Curated annotation (Swiss-Prot):
Keywords: Endoplasmic reticulum, Membrane, Transmembrane, Transmembrane helix. One of its GO terms (biological process) is 3-keto-sphinganine metabolic process. GO terms for cellular component: endoplasmic reticulum membrane; serine palmitoyltransferase complex. GO terms for molecular function: enzyme activator activity. Stimulates the activity of serine palmitoyltransferase (SPT). It is found in: Endoplasmic reticulum membrane. It is a single-pass membrane protein. This is Serine palmitoyltransferase-regulating protein TSC3. It comes from Eremothecium gossypii (strain ATCC 10895 / CBS 109.51 / FGSC 9923 / NRRL Y-1056). The chain crosses the membrane at residues 72-92.
Length: 107
């Protein structure tokens, strides 16, 4: 029961502090919180890809068949690019494994 009383008193203290200092709560922006790690860069890339694909392409000016063809074209290009990247990474992996096997066994 004591913990609940402490929680309530801290909430009251926060409310009093907010009333004295104003009601605005500082929240850092995404740019301020960014650390520059790889997963943030990948997320930013896919976010920009989304904005380019769904927002900037003028589907609303096209007929439904034209927009369908353009949509299919971009999906095919993206899929083939992803396939090529995957094949390249796998070839590097198998080349490395083959080299390591040769270095370890000499055969």
């Amino acid at each position: 029961m004591m913990a609940a009383d402490d929680t309530m008193s801290s909430k009251r203290a926060d409310n009093c502090y907010k009333k004295d200092r104003g009601t605005m709560v500082y929240t850092p922006t995404d740019a301020q919180q960014a650390t520059g790690k790889v997963h943030e860069k990948v997320y930013k890339f896919f976010e920009s890809l989304y904005w380019m694909y769904y927002i900037h392409l003028p589907y609303y000016l096209m007929t439904s068949f034209d927009s369908f063809c353009l949509h299919v074209f971009f999906l095919v290009v993206f899929t083939l690019s992803l396939f090529g990247l995957l094949k390249w990474v796998l070839s590097l992996y198998w080349a490395t494994v083959g080299y390591m096997a040769y270095a370890a066994t000499g055969q």
